C-alpha cells in the first residue's frame, strides 16, 4: 500500500493535484480544501488511498490521516462511491464532519449536492462511533508514535486495536528502560506480537 507521497506540485486541476516525485509523476484526486491548500511548486506530503476496481484504478490524496480515515469509512457505506465521499469532504472539513456525526446533525450533510437525507442517514448509521480524529494516542501522551500507528494500521489492522496495544506496550517496565532510539522498534515488534496473539 502507498501510505504517503512526497513531491512537488507541478499542476493543479479542477479536482486533482499532479505531483512530481524523484522518479514519477502522480495525479491524486483531492478534496476542495486540500486543493486550495497548495500552490504550484509547493513541496507537499499527502496521505494516499489507492482505489481499485476491475476497470478502475485511482489514487486519492489527503491532507492527513484523519481525512483519509473518514474517506475510507465513507466508501464503506452502501451506495457511496469515492466521488461522493470526496464531495462530502469538499463541502465539509473532516473535523466538522466528525462533529456533525457525533451531534447527529443530518441536516448539515444532507444539504450537500447529490447526498440528500436518505444517503446522509445511511452515512450516520454506518459511521457513528467509528471515527477517531487525531487518534486516541494524542490524549495518552503517545502522539510522537503516530507514524508508527499509521504504519501498523496500513498493514490492515483495526485502528482502535492498534491504539490499545501501543498503550499496553508503552506501559511495560521493559519499555521504560530503553533508549529513545530503541523505543519505536520495540513498540512495533511488541504491538504486532500482541495483535497476533
UniProtKB/Swiss-Prot annotation:
Keywords: Cytoplasm, DNA damage, DNA recombination, DNA repair, DNA-binding. The RuvA-RuvB-RuvC complex processes Holliday junction (HJ) DNA during genetic recombination and DNA repair, while the RuvA-RuvB complex plays an important role in the rescue of blocked DNA replication forks via replication fork reversal (RFR). RuvA specifically binds to HJ cruciform DNA, conferring on it an open structure. The RuvB hexamer acts as an ATP-dependent pump, pulling dsDNA into and through the RuvAB complex. HJ branch migration allows RuvC to scan DNA until it finds its consensus sequence, where it cleaves and resolves the cruciform DNA. Homotetramer. Forms an RuvA(8)-RuvB(12)-Holliday junction (HJ) complex. HJ DNA is sandwiched between 2 RuvA tetramers; dsDNA enters through RuvA and exits via RuvB. An RuvB hexamer assembles on each DNA strand where it exits the tetramer. Each RuvB hexamer is contacted by two RuvA subunits (via domain III) on 2 adjacent RuvB subunits; this complex drives branch migration. In the full resolvosome a probable DNA-RuvA(4)-RuvB(12)-RuvC(2) complex forms which resolves the HJ. GO terms for molecular function: ATP binding; four-way junction DNA binding; four-way junction helicase activity. SMART domains: HhH1 (SM00278). Its main location: cytoplasm. Residues 64-139 are annotated as: Domain II. One of its GO terms (biological process) is DNA recombination. Has three domains with a flexible linker between the domains II and III and assumes an 'L' shape. Domain III is highly mobile and contacts RuvB. It is found in: Cytoplasm. NCBIfam families: ruvA. This is Holliday junction branch migration complex subunit RuvA. The keyword Cytoplasm applies. Residues 139 are annotated as: Flexible linker. It comes from the Bacteria. It comes from Borreliella burgdorferi (strain ATCC 35210 / DSM 4680 / CIP 102532 / B31). Residues 140-197 are annotated as: Domain III. The gene is ruvA. Belongs to the RuvA family. It holds the Pfam family HHH_5.
